[in-house]
């Protein structure tokens, strides 16, 4: 359920609407009835910004200060964008400032770790670092002060979030274009891999899927009278002959903040999207459905949101219903498949890019394979030399033992008077091998060491 109370009040302002992260969430296919009762705030959806967590934590802390919340409710979009609201930070409580200081220190520490990781990666010549994007990681912080959260930090955070989220839709369109080009590229490669008969059958199946996808009820133009009346009748359960724009606006202002934000607008397009896309159908692509939802929302914002603050007020909404285009049904809404996301030239460049990346990956894989084979050969030589050395040492030990045994089996020398004469105990004195045998052992050891080649080990994989 959408938040109410102070958090709902934030949605009155275009920037903090974005900061509360409602602009980029895809709405569910079903929506419950409005509930005006106070409910606990739910976790906000992720914007996709790399500083999302920091942004959300700053908002949560500022909301706890009564003075700042009061100024926020009285501020307008220009006050926020110009930095006027940021100066109110000087009047928040010491407890809140302390929390903000700690949040900033944590964010600085996070970015330092990120910088260190990228610098380490830069040491590897095979890794390329985008220095421009690296610098952008710090644009939402005041570089002159890394310890305390000041008005300049709030101003930078607001400006950066406003700019980044304004570019979100363009980035989404570009991502969808690459998705469509990759899908077409893989389709063509698949067809090329088939025999003539199999290719004809695959093409026939694809054409049949495209035909089924095109066969759908007429899609009304988003924001038109026909589209809103359909929501009024089928979703709200009201008499289409008694359609009232003001009542419609109030019904679909879910959090009762006096404006329709982007999420509330996108909820109005659900019935139109269901005419074209069904997740159960093989021919319906859900990625295309989300692109369609975005196109519909952009169309309404372009024609209704006159001050371009990404919010639709009641006055703007009522004014749009007075225009000629509001009641003009025409041919209906042209869906995504009627507007190709890319040209053949863009597809050609995309395929060249894919081929270059594939060649680079293959070259790296080949180098890795060669280095692995070289390491395997070196390891094999090491193992062979180790076994040879072990055998040589064992052989020498056996020769020494044999010599000692032969020495021990010799009879004791006889005394001239016919009595045996035993020598005193000589355990502590080493008994040298006969000169000939010792020379032979030394020669064997020397030859063994000379035969051991130097081992060359690859420096890296």
Curated annotation (Swiss-Prot):
Binding positions (Ca(2+) 1): 253, 255, 257, 264
Bias (Basic and acidic residues): 193-210, 437-461
Stretches for region O-glycosylated at one site: 42-51
A cellular-component GO term for this protein: Golgi apparatus
Residues of the EF-hand domain: 240-275, 292-327
Post-translational modification: O-glycosylated.
Extent of the signal sequence: 1-26
Residue window of motif GBA: 303-333
Region (Binds to GNAI2 and GNAI3): 228-321
Main localization (coarse): Golgi
GO MF term list: calcium ion binding; DNA binding; G-protein alpha-subunit binding; guanyl-nucleotide exchange factor activity
Modified residues (Phosphothreonine): 148
Record has Metal-binding as a keyword: yes
UniProt comment concerning the protein's domains: The EF-hand domains are unfolded in the absence of Ca(2+) and fold upon Ca(2+) addition.
Subunit structure: Interacts (via GBA motif) with guanine nucleotide-binding protein G(i) alpha subunits GNAI1, GNAI2 and GNAI3 with higher affinity for GNAI1 and GNAI3 than for GNAI2. Preferentially interacts with inactive rather than active GNAI3. Interaction with GNAI3 is inhibited when NUCB1 binds calcium, probably due to a conformational change which renders the GBA motif inaccessible.
Protein name: Nucleobindin-1
Naturally occurring in which organism (per UniProt): Homo sapiens (Human)
């Amino acid at each position: 359920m959408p938040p109410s109370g102070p958090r709902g009040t934030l949605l009155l302002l275009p920037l903090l609407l974005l900061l509360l992260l409602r602009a980029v969430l895809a709405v569910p296919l079903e929506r419950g009835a409005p509930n005006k009762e106070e409910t606990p705030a739910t976790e906000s959806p992720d914007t996709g910004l790399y500083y999302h967590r920091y942004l959300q934590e700053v908002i949560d802390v500022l909301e706890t200060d009564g003075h700042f919340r009061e100024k926020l409710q009285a501020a307008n979009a220009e006050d926020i964008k110009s930095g006027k609201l940021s100066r109110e930070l000087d009047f928040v409580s010491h407890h809140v400032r302390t929390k903000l200081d700690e949040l900033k220190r944590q964010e600085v520490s996070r970015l330092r770790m990120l910088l260190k990781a990228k610098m380490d990666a830069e040491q590897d010549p095979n890794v390329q670092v985008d220095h421009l994007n690296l610098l952008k990681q710090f644009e939402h912080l005041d570089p002159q002060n890394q310890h305390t959260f000041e008005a300049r930090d709030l101003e930078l955070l607001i400006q950066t979030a406003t700019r980044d989220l304004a570019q979100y839709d363009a980035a989404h369109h570009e991502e969808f274009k690459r998705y469509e080009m990759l899908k077409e590229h893989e389709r063509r490669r698949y067809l090329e891999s088939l025999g003539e008969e199999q290719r004809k059958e695959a093409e026939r199946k694809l054409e049949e899927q495209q035909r089924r996808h095109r066969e759908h009820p007429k899609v009304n133009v988003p924001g038109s009278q026909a589209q809103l009346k359909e929501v009024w009748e089928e979703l709200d359960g009201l008499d289409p002959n008694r359609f009232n724009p003001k009542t419609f606006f109030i019904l679909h202002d879910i959090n009762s903040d006096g404006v329709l934000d982007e999420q509330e607008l996108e909820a109005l397009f659900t019935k139109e999207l269901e005419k074209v896309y069904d997740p159960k159908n093989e021919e319906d692509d859900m990625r295309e459905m989300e692109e369609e939802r975005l196109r519909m929302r952009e169309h309404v914002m372009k024609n209704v949101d006159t001050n371009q603050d990404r919010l639709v007020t009641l006055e703007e909404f009522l004014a749009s219903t007075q225009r000629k285009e509001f009641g003009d049904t025409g041919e209906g809404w042209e869906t995504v498949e009627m507007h190709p996301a890319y040209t053949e030239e863009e597809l050609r460049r995309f395929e060249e890019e894919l081929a270059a990346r594939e060649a680079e990956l293959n070259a790296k894989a080949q180098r890795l394979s060669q280095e692995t084979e070289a390491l395997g050969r070196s390891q094999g030589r090491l193992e062979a030399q180790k076994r040879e050395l072990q055998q040589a040492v064992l052989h020498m030990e056996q020769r020494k033992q044999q010599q000692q045994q032969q020495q021990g089996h010799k009879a004791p020398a006889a005394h001239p008077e016919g009595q045996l004469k035993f020598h005193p105990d000589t355990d502590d004195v080493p008994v040298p091998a006969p000169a000939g045998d010792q020379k032979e052992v030394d020669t064997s050891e020397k030859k063994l060491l000379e035969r051991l080649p130097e081992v060359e080990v690859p420096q890296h994989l």
